[in-house]
């Protein structure tokens, strides 16, 4: 699972004149890119995107024959890489005539338009290194049992992978991805959009259970989640999955809402996915912040969760209920019904003990004033004991964190 799974671009004279200036300096970060003549094996070890970047550098330097050699090596390793095939055609044509644009066609087909979009997305990825010393603001806290977290940045067609070492998160890799044909913010069945929110990988579907369209496998996520359902959003079947055998990668907006990776990248990703726990944060653009800001946000939300636990344990029902928002729902009851039930239940108890562990705290993307808390709840009282995995959605209401939704996860 390497960082190499990040970048490349293809194109012809007019398109490359702009793109290659932007990516040229960054290509030097690949040590092999400075070699006079890297071997095919060296290029393939660097990964498909890096191989294409090397070819583009050669095109910028007017080394058409060398670029063609690079591309042919890339195609030999990945014969179904359609973008590379298009670049090869451009390079062959460049020997005899100037090229106007990628694909060298003014009346481009839908496929050519898609490949041009992929080329632009690859350049954008190449230019957008994860900021050093910064982290996505969403991932406030992961339990030690959750080893990795995923954050999708749709603006850059990139899925970032972060590793949890028990004390902090570290960027380890990223992958080019395809999202829905109509962009983000899924609302209803069939709108061909990818949802924005906090989700989790809930199952694994092996290749044997799928058609070839989904490639090497699929990992469904829990869309619609509780917040989606509260807002009346519907639809189903949002997966992370691969590509058909005859397709290396797809344009940045080409799915029916799923998150699509190359089969090689999905195979790498599958090694670290934990069914039932790996969080997947999907956003339009990542908000990168300092570790100090994350710590402040984490402490603020952790304090709210702890105060809720303490007030529940105290059997002071009034104090306990002050932690719930005016528009609270558990899926069946609103705040008034919830209040009445809690007063009745707590009146019958002589003591309550509430323990929480394996706490996950995540800010909701696009909603600066909302967060998701998931934890193991160990409840014991004078007449009932149970243990459940609980999920709460917290919002800022009148300057304080309050619970908008609560239920079993």
Annotated model-derived regions:
Residues 55, 297-316, 323:
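Short, aromatic-enriched amphipathic alpha-helices that serve as compact interaction elements
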Residues 127-238, 244-249:
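Gly/Pro-biased beta-strand-loop elements
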Residues 386-409:
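Short beta-strand edge/turn micro-motifs at domain boundaries
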Residues 203-306:
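Exported/periplasmic cell-wall-interacting domains
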Residues 92-137, 351-354:
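Alpha-helical linker/edge segments of TPR/alpha-solenoid repeat scaffolds
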Residues 343-391:
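Surface-exposed, charged secondary-structure patches
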